Structures are given as C-alpha cells and as structure tokens.
Amino acid sequence: MNQVIHGNSLEIIKVIEDESIHLILSDIPYGISFEDWDVLHHNTNSALLGSSPAQEKAGKVFKKRGKPLNGWSEADKKIPKEYYEWCSKWAGDWLRVLKPGGSVFVFAGRRLAHRCIAAMEDAGFIYKDMICWEKETAPHRAQRVSLVYERRGDQENAEKWEGWRLGNLRPLFEPILWFMKPYKIGGTLADNIVEHGVGAYNYIEWSKYNSLTSNMIKVTSNSNDHRKHPTQKPVALMESLIKLTTQEGQIVLDPFCGSGSTLVAAKKLKRNYIG
C-alpha cells in the first residue's frame, strides 16, 4: 500500500487481492509507436521504422515525426487486433481486483480506443462513458506533401499538392474511457454503494471543473508538474477523476503509472495508492 512497485504490470497485479481496489486510473500505452515502449505489435512499415526513402535522405529529421501508425499501409492492418489482444491480457485482472461498482478511467489513443473498449467489455466491464479532455495545445505532425516531392526533386507534383498534408488534424482532445464493474445480480446500485463505497459520482466536485457537469473537461499542466515523461498527464487532471469517483481513505490503483502523476494526486487527496 502507498508504494510504487517496479516490474511487469501484467504479473504484479496477480498478487493484488480480489475486490480490494476502489478506482483504477491509468494512462496506458496507446499502441501508436510514439516511443519504443509504446510499440505493442510487429510492424514492417518502412516509414514507421525510419527507413523510407524520404527518411533515408533526411537522416534523423523525420525519425520521430509524421509516422504512419495505423492503417496507412497493408503492413499496419494487424495493429488494431494486436492491440485488442494486448488489452485483453490485463483486463480480466483489472476486473478481478476492482470492487463491484468501482470505476476505471483509461486514457486511450483516438485510433485504438475502440479496441480497448471491446477488450474491457469482453472481460466483463460496463462501458459507462467517454470523457473528453480538451487541451490548449498539441503537437501537429502532419507533413506537407509538397515538401516530400520537393526533396525528391519532383517540382511538378510539389506544386500540384501544395496545401495538402500527410497525417491527421491537430489532436486537441484526448478520450478518457470510463468503465464500471457491474454490481451483483439481485441487488441495486444504491445497495452496492453502501456495501462497497463506490458506484456513484460526486457532481459537486466535478462542477468545479465543469459547471454543466458534462463529459467535457479542460485542465492544463502547470509549472509544478515537473515533466518526467513524454506523455505525462497533469496532476490536476488526475485529481479531478479521483475526486469524481472516490472518497478519502479509499484505494487507487495505476497499473501503468509512468511518472506517477496518479499517485501524486492520490496522496494529495488523502487516498491510498498502488502503482
């Protein structure tokens, strides 16, 4: 309790007691190959591997930018299924350790969130909602098509495709998937709340972030967050989700705790934590 355990999350979670956790809050790997630790599949796409003709000419300039991640070539078609299979490896244990009525918040990439949802539902969770985290800024890695042709010396196509880009629109929102562990058949959710202390949400706390208590939230990082991780989430954002579904003294689990933002938030809010 109240510690960070270093090791394989898929193995360590097996020693956590059944129905002992009130909330699971985790920023899981998105499977989009943002960094080496986020590659969860076997991929032969030359651009993803940094060996496309344009990348070979440009050296390291494009190694971390403009990468086709999912469905951009026939080589990528297995990625969604492989991501589902990876999520399925831990979803069952998440269900086991969570109390009935307990919530799970999962930060998921927009491209593969549906595969995480399917894996969690197949494990036995109820998919409750998707919270939209609105961000003020976000990196935009859409490469100019005209620039590709310019580097190839193809001026005709460079002019023809001026104004077009490879990639996506600027990602100014991030989905937070909200799941719930079903309560026992024969009871009610109100009964479950009394027995297990979870199953409801605190609309008074949430209204401090969103006056309409809707499924939208806008929280930004501040100087106190001390970024230690490339995909680190603001502590204030983690606080909002913890306050939404738990009370003081309850236990928060983050199986993929990264820089520890979830645990910092839990400690600040007088919740117990495991990461």
Where are these regions (language model features)?
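Core catalytic lobe of class I
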Residues: 2-275
